[in-house]
Design a protein with these regions (language model features):
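SIR2/sirtuin-family catalytic core signature
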Residues: 1-25, 31-35, 247-344
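Gly/serine-rich nucleotide phosphate-binding loop at the start of the catalytic core
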Residues: 1-137, 145
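Extended, H/D-rich, highly charged conserved domains that either
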Residues: 23, 61-92, 125-240
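Residues immediately flanking
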Residues: 28-29, 144, 189, 264
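Short secondary-structure boundary/capping segments
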Residues: 38-46, 153-159, 302-304
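Short, flexible loop segments at boundaries between secondary-structure elements
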Residues: 54-60, 169-185, 283-303
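Alpha/beta-hydrolase fold catalytic core
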Residues: 223-258, 267-268
Length: 344
């Protein structure tokens, strides 16, 4: 890593891309915030406790406390296993089933309260995102919202769908890249993915307009496969329990010539992603910084330099996030006043 002065200057993305190669892209929450400001919530687990419609009750919260997790996939999976064990032992206990559906319902309402509705998603915004994503070899998405998937579906021809098994199931042995296409890997799952009873991952067979409601409340088998906000150690538990998520994280750790990091802070809650990037050992990292002011830019540069201080061979390049197509202010969709603070 070349020594860099912690100054308040940022490169233009087009100029940076012209002089260096960045075939891969890592997306964080900043990419979603560039489109929909309501994605600024801190924790979906917190949102599920305060949403107006069917929030988590103290009884449901006790399930999370007992498992020492904030991740819905882990709590729902444990309850589903309890239901099956009770059935096998002919134990007549309805509480696990009731708690399962109550948690799932609270989760769905929390997601709907913060996620941009399909009806408000402009086609030209999806087209712009689609066009930029298609320029990369692999897009690693650290977000679980639907923006990237909706953008892919807008014009799917240039993208490589790896859910090739029966019923659109992920098959670890069937992942060879098809042609010169862009592959999108969802590091923390997504709202369009579900975990089957056998632990495998399936792509939901739904249209764009129905995806937000696809994991229906009354279906026991389908557990939404996304890892919501929690500690890095807690996230790794879910990742290691999924062949798809394990594959995605393993791919991020593969060597690459250059990686663009857009809207991702690589905070301690995502230490597993930082470790994978360090292991990939790219020649250069292009890191987006929002140009709030010179002091903020200097702080951000210093922060990332500390993250990679023990990897001096990785060149860090900092660019203005607003100069990147995914940070274009024209992508921002106004949030109706009725949706501002709608979760409380």
């Amino acid at each position: 890593m070349e020594p860099l002065a912690a100054n308040g200057e940022l490169e233009n993305w087009d100029a940076l891309r012209a002089r260096k190669s960045f075939p891969d892209l890592l997306l964080g929450n900043g990419a979603s915030l560039a489109v929909w400001r309501n994605f600024a919530y801190f924790s979906l687990f917190d949102e599920a406790q305060t949403t107006r419609n069917r929030p988590l009750s103290p009884t449901e919260l006790s399930v999370f406390r007992a498992m020492d997790t904030n991740i819905f996939e882990q709590a729902l999976g444990a309850l589903r296993n309890s239901i099956r064990v009770n059935a096998a032992l002919t134990i007549n206990a309805s509480s696990p089933r009731h708690r399962y559906f109550a948690i799932k319902e609270a989760l769905i309402h929390a997601i709907r309260s913060v996620h941009i509705p399909w009806s408000q998603m402009p086609a030209d915004t999806l087209a712009s995102i689609n066009q930029e994503l298609s320029r990369y070899r692999t897009v690693y998405n650290g977000n679980y919202d639907l923006l990237t998937y909706w953008a892919e579906l807008h014009a799917p021809g240039g993208f490589d769908n790896i859910f090739r098994g029966s019923d659109a199931t992920f098959e670890p042995t069937y992942t060879a890249r098809k042609g010169n296409t862009t592959r999108i890997l969802y590091l923390h799952g997504g709202l369009h993915l579900v975990k089957n009873a056998d632990g495998s991952t399936r792509l939901l067979n739904s249209s764009e307009s129905t995806l937000l409601a696809s994991f229906a409340i009354n279906q026991l088998g389908d557990i939404p496969l996304f890892v919501n906000e929690s500690s890095s150690e807690d996230k790794l538990k879910s990742i290691r329990g999924s062949d798809y998520l394990s594959y995605c994280l393993g791919q991020l750790a593969q060597p690459t010539e250059g990686l663009c990091i857009f809207g991702h802070s690589l905070s301690k809650q995502d230490h597993h992603l930082l470790h994978a990037v360090q292991q990939a050992s790219p020649k250069a990292l292009a890191i987006s910084i929002y140009p709030h002011n010179s002091n903020f830019i200097e702080q951000q540069k210093s922060y990332y330099q500390q993250l990679f201080a023990e990897h001096p061979h990785i060149e860090l390049c900092f660019f203005n996030s607003m100069s990147h197509p995914l940070g274009n202010p024209g992508l921002r969709v106004p949030v109706p006043k009725s949706d501002l603070g709608a979760t409380h």
